[in-house]
Design a protein with these regions (language model features):
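Short, hydrophobic-biased segments on the C-terminal half of alpha helices
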Residues: 3-4
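Conserved active-site segments centered on acidic
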Residues: 52-131
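Alpha-helix C-terminal capping/helix-to-coil transition sites in glycosyltransferase folds
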Residues: 136-137
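Amphipathic alpha-helical dimerization/coiled-coil segments
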Residues: 28-66
């Protein structure tokens, strides 16, 4: 009964040899099933699964990186801008939100401009935009708030390396404009430290497990920012 069920599911191949039936594992189908299973239950984290996930690309093209937060109006926008300017041609950088705002936070934009960043092309987007089949697969996905990290998102195509760089929401800061501006300055500084560490990694030469460990190490070392 069990072999029949496995055969019907395409996980074993049945072969007749004389009067006997022999079964062997259908490796391609089984591999695909295991990869999908661990992607769904472990979100592609290699320290929690078998080695089914491929290493991020190393074919010379830029790495695709996505930053996620709730509103995609401040933290993820800052992260997108920082990596784009600090990483240069090594990266194609994007950001999105699980509940994106219609406009970007003016204090976040002001801090970015004060630091010399061009903000003219920035916009808020829903994360579903980056899950469409025509959008390039991500190599890295970072959440910069706890809400986005806990969101029950569908598995990302290609099983990108993931990291959680959670930061307090500067939009919720109270006080005068100057006091609230300091919260955004602190967020900018914390993100800059993380991204400087990320861009210093030899991404092209590290295997997937080593990449995941390095990304997690950045998060752990940044908790005192």
């Amino acid at each position: 009964a069990y072999l029949g069920a496995l055969h019907q599911a395409g996980l074993v191949v049945q072969e007749r040899e004389g009067t006997s039936l022999r079964y062997r594992v259908a490796m391609d189908t089984t591999h695909d099933m295991m990869a999908a299973l661990f992607s769904e239950c472990c979100r592609g984290r290699v320290n929690l699964q078998f080695d089914c996930a491929p290493d991020p690309q190393n074919d010379g093209r830029p790495f695709n990186v996505l930053f996620l937060c709730v509103g995609n109006s401040a933290r993820s926008i800052m992260a997108e801008t920082l990596l784009r300017d600090m990483g240069g041609d090594r990266f194609r950088v994007y950001s999105a939100g699980v509940q994106p705002q219609s406009t970007l936070n003016p204090l976040a934009l002001e801090v970015l401009r004060q630091k010399g960043h061009d903000t003219s092309a920035l916009s808020s987007k829903h994360l579903s935009f980056f899950q469409a089949p025509e959008v390039p697969q991500m190599d890295f996905v970072f959440t910069v708030c706890d809400v986005a990290a806990n969101e029950d998102c569908p598995a990302w195509a290609g099983q990108p390396v993931s990291g959680h760089w959670g930061l307090p929401d500067p939009v919720k800061a109270q006080g005068s404009v100057a006091e609230r501006g300091l919260a955004f300055q602190a967020t900018y500084g914390a993100l800059r430290n993380r991204i400087a560490a990320f861009t210093a990694l030899p991404l092209e030469s590290l295997e997937r497990a080593a990449l995941q460990k390095a990304v997690d190490h950045i998060a752990e070392n940044s908790k005192e920012d």
